[in-house]
Amino acid sequence: MSGIPEITAYPLPTAQQLPANLARWSLEPRRAVLLVHDMQRYFLRPLPESLRAGLVANAARLRRWCVEQGVQIAYTAQPGSMTEEQRGLLKDFWGPGMRASPADREVVEELAPGPDDWLLTKWRYSAFFHSDLLQRMRAAGRDQLVLCGVYAHVGVLISTVDAYSNDIQPFLVADAIADFSEAHHRMALEYAASRCAMVVTTDEVLE
């Protein structure tokens, strides 16, 4: 069956549970962009309340810190009501997807975009696909990407790999992302830490 599966609640990882990082990068606000990845009502609706609450709270803490520190903020959001051509192979794995109505498409209220934030239309797993995210980052002289949102092993991880492939240092915030299961979440963290990113917690970013 295609689409988002039923999700059972699980605890978000703590700093002690993170995989070891191979990279030793340091986050610098003047170099960074925060990517709020697909935090739309449609994608958060399947999350159990305890998981949703922790995810949104940590993402909101990140966003507030980024505003204070001068970190550029970017959002991805699917347009909804895609045509067959626009949907492409996505429909074979995820079905028709969301509608274009605000009930599906809006970013959740706690993370509402501000007037200076970049709004990117999301067409495939990677935030960089058919968007000008890379061009905007290059023009702004920013070469670090902090990632939060859903789903960890799908769009979040692929966007992380794409950033790395473009020599942008990704920082994957382990307790500000969520997934279909704890096992999927762990898989994304282990791959990122060993292959393409720094895996950190919200508290570590805010230190």
Curated annotation (Swiss-Prot):
CDD domains: isochorismatase (cd01013). The keyword RNA-binding does not apply. The keyword Lyase does not apply. Disulfide bonds: none annotated. Induction: In liquid cultures (aerobic), phz2 operon is induced by quinolone signal via 2-heptyl-3-hydroxy-4-quinolone (PQS). In biofilm (microaerobic), phz2 operon is induced by quinolone signal via 4-hydroxy-2-heptylquinoline (HHQ), a precursor of PQS. Changing residue 38 to A: Loss of hydrolase activity. Pfam families: Isochorismatase. It catalyses: (2S)-2-amino-4-deoxychorismate + H2O = (5S,6S)-6-amino-5-hydroxycyclohexa-1,3-diene-1-carboxyate + pyruvate. The active site is at residue 38. It is an enzyme of class 3 (hydrolase). Keywords: Antibiotic biosynthesis, Hydrolase, Virulence. GO terms for biological process: phenazine biosynthetic process. One of its GO terms (molecular function) is isochorismatase activity. Gene3D superfamilies: Isochorismatase-like. Pathway: Antibiotic biosynthesis; phenazine biosynthesis. Substrate binds at residues 78, 87, 122, 151-155. Its EC number is 3.3.2.15. Involved in the biosynthesis of the antibiotic phenazine, a nitrogen-containing heterocyclic molecule having important roles in virulence, competition and biological control. PhzD2 (operon phzA2B2C2E2F2G2) has a role in the biosynthesis of the phenazine during both planktonic growth and biofilm development, and in host infection during biofilm development. Catalyzes the hydrolysis of the vinyl ether functional group of 2-amino-2-deoxyisochorismate (ADIC), yielding pyruvate and trans-2,3-dihydro-3-hydroxyanthranilic acid (DHHA). Homodimer. Belongs to the isochorismatase family. This is Phenazine biosynthesis protein PhzD2. The gene is phzD2.
